[in-house]
């Protein structure tokens, strides 16, 4: 678990390569001279090694999860700030056709190159900003001109443009980034991949793009998508979807190879344990029908039936017993589910028991 708990400051250099070197290699032109005290070049475009003037700084915005989903970049319209990037074909917000060749770097003017290699004080590249400000013309211009490595640059919160596109519910942008080879396994400051974010926000459309789209021919796939990858809380995507009680999202993950019995990293709970804790019987039934192991054990030896019995969840206990749960398994404290149960009759998978001709009534 030591690896799963690493914070962003402790992450391996190989994992946290921001791609800055790619920007430096792209920007091989001599630096234009600016007037003393000026924050921009003579062309009027911001220089990539300077931050936006403080006088124009906008307050940061946060999304529903408390994550920063905006930038301190000066203008609310990137197309006004970077007019040199406007192209006739960039007016069309649809992504470039798959397999289209990348334009040679020589077609860029020095001013356009400065704009494309801009980095804000928050570590946001122009690609981050295009996602934040919903500027599709700038976004697809970046996708056409920038090398693949630049797509994976992480800002100061370790977010890639792909993270932000999911945060801001932009499935078309997510699809375009995946087609261009953006990494889907990079983790932000919480250890979340873009798919973790999609599961937490219950964004089925973005999750579909991340799971089902593949890079176009000629694009390098550096690392395959790992559905068992855990964030710093020890949660895989399936755990998050289960806690959100989102059955369509759970089904999508399972169809694409998620391990239904993967254990979270703190106490060893599986999705079935978490479903019991949500106290939603239909979710427990769904996971059992999908093949969840009914007697999966936590690190302390508890099965889902231990949890249901200890919480007095009689209907869920009955469902687990009907699926074959063993009510006599011991945990590390030598307790069985029967020891924890308030009502042993809840374990019996029958509803027509009679004593001396009188029915036994079991209530939840």
UniProtKB/Swiss-Prot annotation:
Residues 36-48 have a biased composition (Low complexity). Residues 93-104 have a biased composition (Pro residues). Coiled coil: none annotated. One of its GO terms (cellular component) is nucleoplasm. The keyword Phosphoprotein applies. Serine phosphorylated; followed by proteasome-dependent degradation. This is NF-kappa-B inhibitor epsilon.
